[in-house]
Swiss-Prot record:
Location of this chain's protein in the cell: Cell membrane
Protein name per the record: ATP synthase subunit c
Membrane topology of this protein: Multi-pass membrane protein
Chief place of localization: membrane
């Protein structure tokens, strides 16, 4: 049962991160298209957002290993 829970947790976290990253990048591209002079600031904010979104699957993998280790 623990293996199934770990697989579901990792899968859902990866799905959410993929959707989140897609939204972040698409909105950044839209912003750069509207205001090219704000490119640097938008890219910096995008990278911070992507890093925060990617932390969720990493935490899910750690929790999955903890569940399997019991």
């Amino acid at each position: 049962m623990g293996v199934l829970a770990a697989a579901i947790a990792i899968g859902l976290a990866a799905l959410g991160a993929g959707i989140g990253n897609g939204l972040i990048v698409s909105r950044t591209v839209e912003g750069i298209a509207r205001q090219p002079e704000a490119r640097g600031m938008l890219q910096t904010t995008m990278f911070i957002g992507v890093a925060l979104v990617e932390a969720i699957p990493i935490i899910a993998v750690v929790i999955a290993f903890m569940v399997q280790g019991r």
